[in-house]
Design a protein with these regions (language model features):
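Acidic/histidine-enriched ion/cofactor-binding microenvironments in catalytic or ligand-binding pockets
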Residues: 221-228
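Short helix-capping segments at alpha-helix termini
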Residues: 191-196, 222, 307-314
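His/Asp/Glu-enriched, well-ordered alpha-helical/loop segment
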Residues: 156, 278-288, 295-318, 322-323, ...
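Divalent metal-binding segments
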Residues: 1-215, 230, 234-296, 316-317, ...
């Protein structure tokens, strides 16, 4: 007998739209082995759903790290197949997408569009024209403009989304990066009594003023009709497989736009991150950071030290989501400063080859080092980051216990943990992360 599984980090709101998008993931999650496979998946989806000319075609799960021989999806592939439809295929990291020409035009992206700090706009070789892939801060204005479903559609989607989680044994889900309009969707669902699993939301720091104009600090930390505002989310960097995570040393493969000596870039400056976290702490709220690279984790630690004024006695349960390329010395700091880690061992299966290419075998082998973290005394959890990876809690457990790649190769076997420890990461430890250890896990 096991308790209901607790999701330490995913994107619940994305489950609502899964049925409205084509699965463009590579095997074993989806059928798209190469750019042609992505196009076929989109065409089949458009045919089955009778999408008319001019209507948007959406896909999810595109993984450039799995495309053969560096043959990456670009706008030309999509333009040829969909000359009359805007098309957007979400990157597997959820930090960007590949758009065709009509979609680029729809969202105002052109040769005149400058790349913002912390953003990526891949350009067609020899030109300044966007070639399809838009990532990180450059993608945020596009994401904000995505079409919204009707109220009737939302009601059905909320039910189907919860069933994705419930079918995997999850009784507490996380909406781990919530825009205000998505929070309103969740709030309306809760008010209507449509939630049958618990959902914990972490609104983006960039929308904190708008959120706090609707809610008070007393609204955080408690469930109301199965919805809880857990705290605030601060995203410090991107994804390592997308080469947008922020490191102290360069990527072996350069940057996504061909940059040399590329270490990635932070989403915000250190000073901005410091001020953001202090605002969260001054409100008495929990913070979850998104940080993958070791330089991004350094920024989280510095912000925590600044915002806390060096007082680490308060029970804040600040959590660094992913913590994938954390260094041993940073784990020591986690313990000293009472920072939690939510790891992501499924990367040892899904993205190990990309990490070895990008970061080298030694660093890739210390990916999500749960055994070392637990031995040092770090309280840690383990997550899917759905829909980056499928909702499958037993796969989460398996990946932490075995650390085997898609190709059957061990990835840092010295960091394997026991089945019991792996279960704790999605039950009792996850309950602790949410301040719910007295009643869950």
């Amino acid at each position: 007998m096991l308790p209901g599984f607790i999701d330490p980090h995913s994107h619940f709101i994305n489950s609502l739209s899964m049925s409205d998008q084509a699965n463009c993931s590579p095997p074993p999650v989806g059928p798209a082995k190469d750019p042609d496979g992505v196009v076929v998946a989109l065409q089949e989806f458009a045919r089955i759903n009778k999408i008319e000319a001019g209507e948007m075609v959406m896909g999810y799960g595109y993984d450039d790290s799995q495309m053969p021989d560096g043959n990456l999806l670009n706008r030309d592939h999509l333009d040829k197949a969909f000359p009359e439809n805007p098309v957007m295929v979400m990157h597997v990291s959820l930090h960007g997408a590949v758009l065709n020409s009509l979609a680029l035009k729809k969202y105002g992206m052109s040769a005149k569009t400058t790349t913002p700090p912390g953003g990526v706009i891949v350009r067609k070789p020899g030109t300044n024209e966007p070639y399809g892939l838009i990532m990180e801060t450059a993608f945020l204005p596009i994401f904000a403009q995505l079409p919204k479903p009707s109220s009737d559609q939302l009601k059905a989607q909320v039910k189907s989304g919860q069933m994705i989680y419930a079918s995997a044994g999850i009784t507490t889900a996380q909406e781990g990066a919530t825009h205000l309009h998505d929070l309103i969707i969740l709030q309306n669902a809760a008010d209507a009594g449509d939630l049958f699993i618990d959902v914990v939301s972490y609104p983006f720091i960039t929308e904190i003023d708008s959120v706090m104009s609707r809610y008070t600090t007393s609204d955080f930390g408690q469930y109301k009709n199965r919805l809880k505002l857990g705290g605030i989310k601060i995203t410090i960097d991107g994804s390592p497989q997308g080469r947008t995570a922020f490191f102290t040393s360069p990527y072996l493969t350069g940057g996504p736009e061909g940059q040399k000596n590329w270490t990635g870039e932070p989403t915000f400056s250190q000073a901005t991150a410091n001020d953001m976290l202090k605002k969260v702490y001054d409100l008495g709220l929990q913070c979850t950071f998104h940080a993958n690279g070791d330089a991004a984790i350094d920024m989280c630690i510095k912000a925590h030290e600044y915002a806390s004024g060096g007082d680490f006695t308060k029970d804040r349960r600040t959590t660094v989501i992913h913590s994938q390329f954390v260094r041993p010395d940073q784990l020591d700091t986690y313990v000293k400063e009472k920072i939690l880690a939510s790891f992501y061992t499924e990367h040892t299966f899904f993205f190990a080859d990309a990490h070895i290419r990008n970061r080298g075998e030694a660093q890739a082998s210390f990916l999500s080092p749960m055994k070392t973290a637990l031995a040092k005394g770090v309280k840690c959890t383990n997550h899917t980051d759905f829909n980056v990876a499928p909702i499958d809690q037993l796969l989460v457990v398996w990946s932490a216990v075995n650390r085997i790649s898609r190709n059957g190769e061990p990835i840092g076997p010295e960091e394997c943990i026991t089945p019991y420890q792996s279960l704790q990461a999605i039950t009792s430890n996850a309950a602790y992360q949410y301040f719910e250890e007295d009643r869950k896990g």
